[in-house]
């Protein structure tokens, strides 16, 4: 619904969830320019001078959209909220993906007036799945142009008259029947977070994450080789509570992340493995080269379909993903110690 045209630019960081990456297809279909702003290994942060260069690409005669996550769902890097004001000054609308940030951090939209802010209630308090929200500034919402209509989004529609009238925003963007059976849970969840306090939640997660990072960094095989390689920040400065890493044997070869997940399941530990729907950060962290990807995607048998297992074979047995462990408001030190005990089983 964003009014992309051939005079528009869609700028996004390499570090973005696929839900944000996918917007590029709408932009390209309308002739807009799409630009990616890289993050730099090993910390997976953006260089400020590169940001300034890319923000200068705003087209004066078109709508420009800059999208980035407040917190990476791959590395847990917390990108500066100050970018919002900098981008506005350079002529950009800003989409701030706060899905990973909002569960454990206070976000003041008066101080940081992003135009569009998607959040996930499931990530904030674990229930219900499939219910989120797009928080949009009124002026930004007026820019959106729905390319179609559906039930629940119009006041009047006619077949013979070939006409429809959209409902006032935000109802014009809420397709179908709202999930009224689960929506009351959102109120309960928000009240619970408020009763605990976001500052307390933030500090608790920071302490647990710091303890986990410290212990993972210290784990070494008997020959001195590190067991764990952490992607992104190795301390708690400007980072969230998810840690992405790979495990290595004493010879320095990566241990397959899928196998680690299977082992974790047997120990009653829930992990996420893969690239976590964030291919840009994953490709840079794992040193997957553009030419390797091009060679893989251009194979005749990969024109229409490519499974994840086929992709893993295609990139010469490089690590195609990582292991992610997430610390949240209900995590405690016993959870951390159980995970660390599990990790120690890989030491040789």
Feature map (PLM): residue ranges:
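Pyridoxal 5′-phosphate
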Residues: 1-348
